[in-house]
Amino acid sequence: MDMTPASADGLIVLGKITSVHGVRGEVKVYSFTDPIDNLLDYRFWTLRRGDERRQIELVRGRPQGRLLVARLKGIEDRDGARALADFEVCVPIAQLPRLDEGEFYWHQLEGLRVVDREGRLFGKVDHLLETGANDVLVVRPCTGSLDDRERLLPYTDQCVLRVDLAAGEIRVDWDADF
């Protein structure tokens, strides 16, 4: 799975510009992709901050520690780079690589109903957490839920029995009392 939050405008957020790097207009980018340099595979970025949108071309980039350093077309100095701080880096969802069968992007799982083997509704996937060992579904109660408890369910083969995107449902093997 890949942790990628989707948006209603057909874009997916893959990173965020955090600050400037040096004096020649480069920016530091926190990448949400795994590995982080996958973000550099996209030549054109849509930068988004609130209602503001800006199309920009990636000239080059490189990993530096836990961040990326990127040179963007038309950004030639520190002031231009500073003006881009806090912009989200987005690309069209349609440009994401196709996944193998049984693999999903996080944005595809968010909002799905979670039911147990008996069909009892636990709630809907609010978001996911990356723990290192495995990803975790954060399931929040919704209308018709079994109870009002938030549940953290491991995204493992033992727990997740089936993901049905068409039906909007994830079937799990999980004790309702746990």
From Swiss-Prot:
Task: Show the InterPro entries listed in the entry.
Answer: PRC_barrel-like_sf (IPR011033), PRC_RimM (IPR056792), RimM (IPR011961), RimM_N (IPR002676), RimM_N_sf (IPR036976), Transl_B-barrel_sf (IPR009000)
What's one GO-annotated cellular component?
Answer: cytoplasm
Q: What is its main location?
A: cytoplasm
Keywords attached to this Swiss-Prot or TrEMBL record, sorted alphabetically, are: Chaperone, Cytoplasm, Ribosome biogenesis, rRNA processing
Q: Does the keyword rRNA processing apply?
A: yes
One GO biological process this protein is involved in is: rRNA processing
Does the keyword section mention Ligase?
no
Q: Where in the cell is it found?
A: Cytoplasm
The family database entries (Pfam families) matched by this protein are listed as: PRC_RimM, RimM
Looking at the record, the residues that make up the PRC barrel domain are: 100-178
Question: Which GO molecular function annotation, any one, does this entry have?
Answer: ribosome binding
Question: Per its UniProt record, what NCBIfam families does this chain match?
Answer: 16S_RimM
Quaternary data: Binds ribosomal protein uS19.
- Please quote what the entry notes about the protein's domains: The PRC barrel domain binds ribosomal protein uS19.
Family, as annotated: Belongs to the RimM family.
Function, please? An accessory protein needed during the final step in the assembly of 30S ribosomal subunit, possibly for assembly of the head region. Essential for efficient processing of 16S rRNA. May be needed both before and after RbfA during the maturation of 16S rRNA. It has affinity for free ribosomal 30S subunits but not for 70S ribosomes.
Q: What is this protein called?
A: Ribosome maturation factor RimM
According to its UniProt entry, this protein's organism is Azotobacter vinelandii (strain DJ / ATCC BAA-1303)
Q: Which gene is annotated as encoding this protein in its UniProt record?
A: rimM
